[in-house]
Swiss-Prot record:
Its main location: endoplasmic reticulum. The chain crosses the membrane at residues 188-208, 227-247, 254-271, 275-295. The keyword Chaperone does not apply. Gene3D superfamilies: Longin domain. It comes from Macaca fascicularis (Crab-eating macaque). The gene is SEC22A. It is found in: Endoplasmic reticulum membrane. The modification Phosphoserine is found at residues 6, 8. This is Vesicle-trafficking protein SEC22a. Residues 209-226, 272-274 are lumenal. Belongs to the synaptobrevin family.
Length: 307
């Protein structure tokens, strides 16, 4: 029989469980799935906002939005469209009931356990398709899942549960590590946003001066072609610093220092065309953005909450 078995609401940044259904079974398979719940909660910050983990006879589905993740366990034959429609209802109700300040400042696990009442009512509706079919329209959800299907989490990415062996576990290098394409950075700070804007400004200034240098060269005013290259390299370096500030990539800190070195070299070559204040501004902004890239690291692992 296809059905929803349990659901949880978890804070993304640290895996703190905010609420959960309390009527789950105590079978061996269910207990193993609860351990997968715990492992997923530690990696939510590194995963896409819509995912599915298949664990044999059960599927774990979740969606994340505004720093909160909504996770559910169902049988493997439960329809995907109903599973994500169920999660969507939980999300809408939770956002309506609790503001972001409450969820961000919560310190105790299950501090919104009263939300379990809504989880239970919604779960009963979705486990009774006859009463459900006339009350919701699934066409939008079907279209959304077709256009943007949930990311399939492999056991390699999840790693092996502590003390748990699974027939679906496989040996692979780097198990438990999420690819950099799905890695998330810590929330941007005000200084990071300022650095991003200043780096864009420096890139724009370099680009404008580069076009002026091309114009001067065409008019045979004697500008060196190497100046044009230096201006455009400076533009590329500033834009790449913006990219590193926003997105996670391998060897990110090393790339940021190399990019800052390129900015310094370009400004050293352009010292005849810029005064000391201009040189100081460009180099200082480059150093500031490099610092912000170094400070804004990938979100770390969550504490070991018993989810």
């Amino acid at each position: 029989m296809s059905m929803i078995l349990s659901a949880s609401v978890i804070r993304v940044r640290d895996g703190l469980p905010l609420s959960a259904s309390t009527d789950y079974e105590q079978s061996t398979g269910m207990q193993e799935c609860r351990k997968y719940f715990k492992m997923l909660s530690r990696k939510l910050a590194q995963l896409p906002d819509r995912c599915t983990l298949k664990t044999g006879h059960y599927n774990i589905n979740f969606i994340s939005s505004l720093g909160v993740s909504y996770m559910m366990l169902c049988t493997d034959n439960y329809p995907n469209v109903l599973a994500f429609s169920f999660l969507d209802e939980l999300q809408k109700e939770f956002i309506t009931t609790y503001n972001m300040m409450k969820t961000n400042t919560a310190v105790r696990p299950y501090c919104f356990i009263e939300f379990d009442n809504f989880i239970q009512r919604t779960k009963q509706r979705y486990n009774n398709p006859r009463s459900l079919s006339t009350k919701i329209n699934l066409s939008d959800m079907q279209t959304e899942i077709k256009l943007r299907p949930p990311y399939q989490i492999s056991m390699c990415e999840l790693g092996s549960a502590n003390g748990v062996t699974s027939a679906f576990s496989v040996d692979c290098k780097g198990a438990g590590k999420i690819s950099s394409a799905h890695q998330r950075l810590e929330p941007a700070t005000l200084s990071g946003i300022v650095g991003f804007i200043l780096s864009l400004l420096c890139g724009a200034l370099n680009l404008i001066r580069g076009f002026h240098a091309i114009e001067s060269l065409l008019q045979s005013d004697g500008d060196d072609f190497n100046y044009i290259i230096a201006f455009f390299l400076g533009t590329a370096a500033c834009l790449y610093q913006c990219y590193l500030l926003v997105y996670y990539t391998g060897w990110r800190n090393v790339k940021s220092f190399l990019t800052f070195g390129l900015i310094c070299l370009c400004n050293m070559y352009l010292y005849e065309l810029r005064n000391l204040w201009q040189l100081f501004f460009h180099v200082t902004v480059g150093a500031f953005v490099t610092l912000q890239i170094w400070l804004r690291q990938a979100q770390g692992k969550a504490p070991d909450y018993d989810v």
